[in-house]
Amino acid sequence: MNKCGDSIRVVHPLFQEEGGGSIPTSPLQLHIGEISSKQAILLNELWHSRMPRLDCYAVCKPCFAAEFENIFYAIAMWSLPIAANRLKNGKESLELRRMAIADDAPKNTASRMLKIMTMMIRKQRPDIKRLISYQDTGVHSGTIYAAAGWNPAHKGKYQTWGKHSKRPGQIEQSKSDKVRWEFTL
């Protein structure tokens, strides 16, 4: 883990842009665009409250970041659904694996970012018909999904991967119940 966390938040443009280093006051000020999965994982380690560890450099694509005046304020990482074989048309879906927001990001950053990413994925990936995300009910109420126009599709009780799982040795990151939210493209 990078010990000098502030430095990885800087976008590092080729030329310094104008601006006084102010903090954005509205999510409308944030520019949302794609970043590398490696950069997204580093930022996730800084900001994610419950699941900072994620090692999916080759799996998570696309990854997005929200930035203002060359400073990152949020990231989101997408992949094919982990349980695509259990979902109807799972191969035509993308799962939001992680979304992490800096403490100094403007209010409503998450719902704005969801809305913009939805539009970008729709345009760039016509093969994707549905977006899904699993809400950890232990720490989230689902407000960001509702505000972005997503629908709660399934509520599930916590289940362990179990000792007979195809994922032996996996660390249980959260034992809370989950809500699967969906957005049809």
Locate each region found by the language model.
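Acyl-donor-binding surface of acyltransferase catalytic domains
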Residues: 1-15
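Conserved beta-hairpin
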Residues: 44, 59-77
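Acyl-donor binding region in acyl/amide transferases
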Residues: 31-35, 75, 79-177
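Short acidic/polar alpha-helix capping motifs at helix-coil junctions
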Residues: 5-7, 26-27, 107-110
